[in-house]
Amino acid sequence: MIQQETWLQVADNSGIKKVMCIKVLGGSKKRYASVGDEIIVAVKDAQPAFGLKDSTGKKVHNKAVQRAVVVRTTKEIRRPDGSYIRFDDNACAIIDDKGNPKGTRIFGPVARELRDKKYAKIISLAPEVL
């Protein structure tokens, strides 16, 4: 469960390493995000030398605001068959306004629930889908 002020690892090669959630998208009353939910994040640790650029053409730096989708959470997720899955860390992938990932690789496993939320591109880039 991701909420405001939660720090997350970035699971792609966009050059951003750590981010902090500043807003959970999906309505004014939505407080928590789970796997597959979109969030607004503030960059806390970035390597601008990688060349990722924001919508204005400037290189991404600390304090930049980006959109992201949650790909892993430490809070377990219940599946329809009754099983649960959880991960060792909270992680997200940086996306653009259309929902496409900005990175070209995804590191670590991602949850199968992303397929139901229409993030097939992230699923195809991930090395393992659990």
Curated annotation (Swiss-Prot):
UniProt entry keywords in alphabetical sequence: Ribonucleoprotein, Ribosomal protein, RNA-binding, rRNA-binding
Top-level taxon: Bacteria
Disulfide bonds: none
GO biological process: translation
Cellular component annotations (GO), alphabetically ordered: cytosolic large ribosomal subunit
Gene3D superfamilies: Ribosomal protein L14
Protein's UniProt keywords contain RNA-binding: yes
InterPro entries attached to this UniProt entry: Ribosomal_uL14, Ribosomal_uL14_bac-type, Ribosomal_uL14_sf
Keyword Ribonucleoprotein among record annotations: yes
A UniProt-annotated Pfam family: Ribosomal_L14
Stored SMART domains: Ribosomal_L14
GO molecular function per UniProt: large ribosomal subunit rRNA binding; structural constituent of ribosome
CDD domains: Ribosomal_uL14 (cd00337)
Family, per entry: Belongs to the universal ribosomal protein uL14 family.
Assembly: Part of the 50S ribosomal subunit. Forms a cluster with proteins L3 and L19. In the 70S ribosome, L14 and L19 interact and together make contacts with the 16S rRNA in bridges B5 and B8.
Its biological purpose: Binds to 23S rRNA. Forms part of two intersubunit bridges in the 70S ribosome.
Protein name: Large ribosomal subunit protein uL14
Organism of provenance: Leptospira borgpetersenii serovar Hardjo-bovis (strain JB197)
Gene expressing this chain: rplN
